[in-house]
């Protein structure tokens, strides 16, 4: 039976450590500050943004949300970002995705100054991360997965890591991190056009799935002893839940848990790590500001 990789508990420990670092910065006259820009009133986005600002405040950081109307123009949004870029009390800027269709999300993300891009999506940070520059802000989900593997003493050196999915937000930066000197993993990336997906997933010592499709990975697709990291977030109807739904991952958890050596649950696995690494990146941004 696989041990459960508890992202909630790992996050709790990390946040306690970070709270001490925040207090030390405050003693030096710097309070880390994160500003989140939310366009529109999507309930899921509102809830996610609220959880981010609450997490900031729980550590003694400043967390603020700027809510703009659904029909905000690109120019007006850029003006808000310009103001935040110029504000020395704001160390991290995050524009909550998804954006309305009329806003060019790539241009929006690139308008954030790289030194405040705590989501790690700016091309400058992507390039710095690719070459292993410590100044880079690494996207929060890949960074959280790496931290989870490290803290759970799961070795990656010489291991075959198979990633299902090829997104710029998770899979590609994660592959780069895993192949870097230190982690030293051999990485295979698969995607929707990969023929015979199971022939690849069965080779994995560590299987990371980030697609967004319920039960994509079944028990016959993994080998005994595999470590499974499930990044998927899928909403399924559940009349027994007060909300009328529950969240599940991309992996058939109940079927694979008896086979694997370790596995992340959904919820409570990778998700908490993502928000915690956003806090870590904001703390890093404040430190880098102090050093300049």
Swiss-Prot record:
Q: Which Pfam families does the protein's record reference?
A: THF_DHG_CYH (PF00763), THF_DHG_CYH_C (PF02882)
* InterPro entries membership: Aminoacid_DH-like_N_sf (IPR046346), NAD(P)-bd_dom_sf (IPR036291), THF_DH/CycHdrlase (IPR000672), THF_DH/CycHdrlase_cat_dom (IPR020630), THF_DH/CycHdrlase_CS (IPR020867), THF_DH/CycHdrlase_NAD-bd_dom (IPR020631)
Q: What is its EC number?
A: 1.5.1.5, 3.5.4.9
| Chain residues that bind NADP(+) | 165-167
**The keyword Nucleus appears for this protein:** no
This entry's Gene Ontology molecular function terms read: methenyltetrahydrofolate cyclohydrolase activity; methylenetetrahydrofolate dehydrogenase (NADP+) activity
Q: Does the keyword Transcription apply?
A: no
Q: Which UniProt keywords apply?
A: Amino-acid biosynthesis, Histidine biosynthesis, Hydrolase, Methionine biosynthesis, Multifunctional enzyme, NADP, One-carbon metabolism, Oxidoreductase, Purine biosynthesis
Annotated Gene Ontology cellular component terms: cytosol
Which BP terms in the Gene Ontology apply to this protein? Answer: L-histidine biosynthetic process; methionine biosynthetic process; purine nucleotide biosynthetic process; tetrahydrofolate interconversion
Named in its record, the pathway it takes part in is: One-carbon metabolism; tetrahydrofolate interconversion
Catalyzed reaction equations: (6R)-5,10-methylene-5,6,7,8-tetrahydrofolate + NADP(+) = (6R)-5,10-methenyltetrahydrofolate + NADPH; (6R)-5,10-methenyltetrahydrofolate + H2O = (6R)-10-formyltetrahydrofolate + H(+)
Concerning its family, UniProt says: Belongs to the tetrahydrofolate dehydrogenase/cyclohydrolase family.
Instruction: Outline what the protein does.
Output: Catalyzes the oxidation of 5,10-methylenetetrahydrofolate to 5,10-methenyltetrahydrofolate and then the hydrolysis of 5,10-methenyltetrahydrofolate to 10-formyltetrahydrofolate.
Q: Which proteins does it associate with, and in what oligomeric form?
A: Homodimer.
NCBIfam families named among the record's database cross-references: PRK14186.1
What is the protein's given name? Answer: Bifunctional protein FolD 1
Q: Which organism is it from?
A: Myxococcus xanthus (strain DK1622)
Task: Output the lineage of the source organism.
Answer: Bacteria, Pseudomonadati, Myxococcota, Myxococcia, Myxococcales
Q: Which gene encodes it?
A: folD1
């Amino acid at each position: 039976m696989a041990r459960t990789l508890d992202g909630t508990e790992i996050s709790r420990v990390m946040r306690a450590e970070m709270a001490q670092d925040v207090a030390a910065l405050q003693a030096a006259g710097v309070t880390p500050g994160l500003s989140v820009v939310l366009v529109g009133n999507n309930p899921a986005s509102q809830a996610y943004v609220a959880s981010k600002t609450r997490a900031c405040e729980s550590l003694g950081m400043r967390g603020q949300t700027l809510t703009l109307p659904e029909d905000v123009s690109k120019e007006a949004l850029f003006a808000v970002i310009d103001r935040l870029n110029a504000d020395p009390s704001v160390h991290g800027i995050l524009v909550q995705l998804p954006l309305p269709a009329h806003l060019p999300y790539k241009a929006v993300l690139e308008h954030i100054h790289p030194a405040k891009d705590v989501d790690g999506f700016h091309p400058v940070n992507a390039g710095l991360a690719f070459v292993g520059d410590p100044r880079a802000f690494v996207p929060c989900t890949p960074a959280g997965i790496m931290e989870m593997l490290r803290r759970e003493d799961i070795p990656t050196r010489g291991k075959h890591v198979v990633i299902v999915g090829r997104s710029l937000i998770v899979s590609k930066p994660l592959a780069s991190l895993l192949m870097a000197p230190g982690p030293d993993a051999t990485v295979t990336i698969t995607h929707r056009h990969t023929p015979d997906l199971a022939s690849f997933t069965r080779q994995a010592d560590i299987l990371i799935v980030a697609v967004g499709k319920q039960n994509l990975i079944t028990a016959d697709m993994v080998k005994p002893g595999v470590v499974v990291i499930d990044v998927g977030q899928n909403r399924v109807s559940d009349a027994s839940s007060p909300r009328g739904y529950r969240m599940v991952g991309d992996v058939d958890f109940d079927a694979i848990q008896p086979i694997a050596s370790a596995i992340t649950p959904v919820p409570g696995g990778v998700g908490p790590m993502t928000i915690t690494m956003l806090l870590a990146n904001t703390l890093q941004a404040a430190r880098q500001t102090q050093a300049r």
